[in-house]
Amino acid sequence: MHIIKTLISVGVAFSLSACLSLEGVEIAGLEGKSSGTLTKYRCENGYKASIKQRDNGVVSIAFNDGKDSYVSYLNHVPSASGTLYVNDKNTLKWHQKNNIAVFTYPDRNYAKTGQLVTTNCHKY
């Protein structure tokens, strides 16, 4: 009986450790296929990102940091140059011009530092 309780505890711990942890990002469920143009990018920090155009000036961004995957929705906002999308919390920004984008996202310690990090991403 003790072994079974230990195995259950270990299983719960592994399940919880697999949860997404990036602070300041809304984690959305992955939805089924929908219409829209999908564009893929590789970022200088090692991230891979996919941007999908949605309705009403909204894009979904899916990105992977090599460990965890995230999905969020960003709204189009006016920009002097290129196309800019921002989430409601202003913690994710995707500023795209031609085949290059600047991706701004929360630092891993965002809850403590409030710092955002930026990387350049290239369409492939």
Swiss-Prot record:
Main location: membrane
InterPro entries, alphabetized: MliC, MliC_sf
UniProt signal peptide: 1-18
Residues with lipidation of kind N-palmitoyl cysteine: 19
One GO cellular component term noted in the UniProt record for this chain: plasma membrane
Lipidation (S-diacylglycerol cysteine): 19
Keyword vocabulary terms for this entry: Cell membrane, Lipoprotein, Membrane, Palmitate, Signal
Matches recorded under Pfam families: MliC
Organism the protein comes from: Pasteurella multocida (strain Pm70)
The protein's name in its UniProt record: Uncharacterized lipoprotein PM1176
Compartment annotation: Cell membrane
Membrane topology classification: Lipid-anchor
